[in-house]
Amino acid sequence: MLLTRSEPFGIELIVDEYDEYSFTGKEFGAIVQYPAANGAVRDYTDFTAAAHAKGVLVTAAADLLSLALLKSPGEWGADIAVGSTQRLGTPMGFGGPGAGYMATREAYKRNMPGRIIGVSVDRLGNKALRMALQMREQHIKRERATSNICTASALMASMVGFYCVYNGPEGLKRAADTAHLAAATVADALQAMDYKLAAADFFDTLEVSAEAAVVQSLALENGINFYYPTEGSVRMSFDEVTTPEEVAEVIRIFAAAKGRKAKAVKPVTESRVPAALRRRTAYLSEAVFNTYRSESDLMRYIKKLELRDISLANSMISLGSCTMKLNAAALMQPLSLAGFQMMHPFAPADQAEGYMQLITELENDLATITGFAACSLQPNSGAAGEYAGLMVIRAYHQSRGQGYRNVVLIPASAHGTNPASAAMAGMKIVTVACDDKGNIDVEDLKAKAGEYSSELCGLMVTYPSTHGVFESRIREIVDAVHDAGGQVYMDGANMNAQVGLTNPGYIGADVCHLNLHKTFAMPHGGGGPGVGPICVAEHLRAFLPSHPVMPTGGDEGITAVASAPWGSAMLLPITYGYIKMLGGNGLRRTTEMAIVNANYMSSALAPEYRTYYSGETGRVGHEMILDLTSFKKDYNIDCGDIAHRLMDYGFHAPTLSFPVHETLMVEPTESEPKAEMDRFIEALVSIKRECEAAAGQADNVVANAPHTAVEIAGEWTHPYTRAEAAFPLAWVREAKFFPYVTKIDNGYGDRNLCCRNCE
């Protein structure tokens, strides 16, 4: 992963021994693993001090569970800590999904990439949570953003959070002790048989000098997998569910490898972590991690939080460019099967035949649907898919001796991830103008393709466009780029309007990514996990992402874009089932219904809300942009006020001010029945009437939205009634949703960034 990310920027990677390296002052950063891959627990205090003396920042790739026993990276001087949260309560799932983490010091918090949830205050002065520092993110800063991240694995992070809530610091300490003491017991036994360990100090992993082939044969006979880094070494890890019987079996295997009979071993009961590296500071000290210790308590805590969210279980979520469709129960069921949950991503191929059949069939299905020759499931999000696709194009040009091609054309209407991903791939971004109807300005594109023909890498294009229309000249656009020597990357964010009717291959693109969490029915999970596979034409097949451990990808594949060879493999049965259950005709029908639903809503709302862009036929694709640009002048109400007021009607806000300022982007998907769309339409029409009635009044029902139950029940000084605030239409009473907080002060939250201990 480091090699993949660093190479486009020309960053030199130096792999060396931490205790032998001397900093020169040319370095900008260093990364160490804690514990190391071979299990070694090392004291990096002197290394970090030497780095800081030369102005170098240090990152620790740290195992979270180990930190229940080991001194925290911050204590020995690290500036940043990163890693996986998977082992805190989420299954391996043949590689994922799992949430990563990144932590840093106070001084660097405003340079953090990705989503940050911070504390602010609402209109009534109550503490409220919100996404903080959005100005640094890709949807605003585009190629100047701190990352291309759009998806955050919020669902997996929540699962890890609940695991920590339930177990608390004492539970994590108990789990860490179990893993460590099992490793220590095996270490003593192996050393007694004259095996040599790679590291004297360890947490839960041992690397042993042994004849790998002999040990592997014996281990497989006993149903155990080890990892074999070389022909002369064996590596094993233990965890909180390792049993005494399994410890004894491991010892017997190594005894048999030496032709011996295992002797009884006394279990180790005291920590072997060096005193200088033992943790002495508190963790998980907040009340929430020390309160819920029964399943009933935890269930009620989770339910309390769930009731504060508007989800698809409440009403339609009209977020444009997000495709919030039904996640059918039948598709979700396989996720609970142990065979999918418990498979290790590096398990021998003959132990993963079911997974491999599923992966192969799904790759073939997605390639067929997109009109391409091959597919990689490795990217873990749409943004990661964009990056992977661009890196494949880059590798293709390099293979032809044209590595100097580094210009990417991107329409002004494109989602911010496009230029952010291009920047991460080391590309120079040239923006292509759009015309008054929201289409790509073809003449401007042709002019820029010609101007940069000697260095053109490609074009990033979305179809239908981010403006929600099918561009009639899309093939002409593709041909112009090809004629200039470039490749065409198609953003698959809007594939829900293509499947079964057309495809990127037919249009002429060379590569596309898909959002399985949009078009192909995986849950969004409050932001993730996502899966963003790429599909490519035949001439790009050889460059699909490879992996350093498991054979996958093309013969000349780019280096890995994710830690797991097939990305978040445990989620793949969802999309596999979606495709198999619908079949070709069903997939086409879903696309048709998505387009019909969007056009129905656009037409129904037309008397009150103009659709900002439409195609040559006067129709939209699968989503529409509602024009609210005059509301501020006419009513002193902006699109954010209307989005907030929709919450009082029981609806999640649409996409706000994207891709056009002061607009709402609405995408109903094929999943919504007419009755639900009609309720949403009625709500928007009713809000328009409220805006008209409120014109010129600062204290009005729209500007003050949303209204909480506490506010409704408290002292009332507004010129409108409580009933008008809480129950604006009769059907709202049937299943009223009260937001937990009212309108949040975004500026306050950014000026006073606080993410923890913010009481």
Describe the residue ranges of each PLM region.
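Short strand-loop junctions, especially beta-strand C-caps/beta-turns
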Residues: 34-35, 239, 380, 435, ...
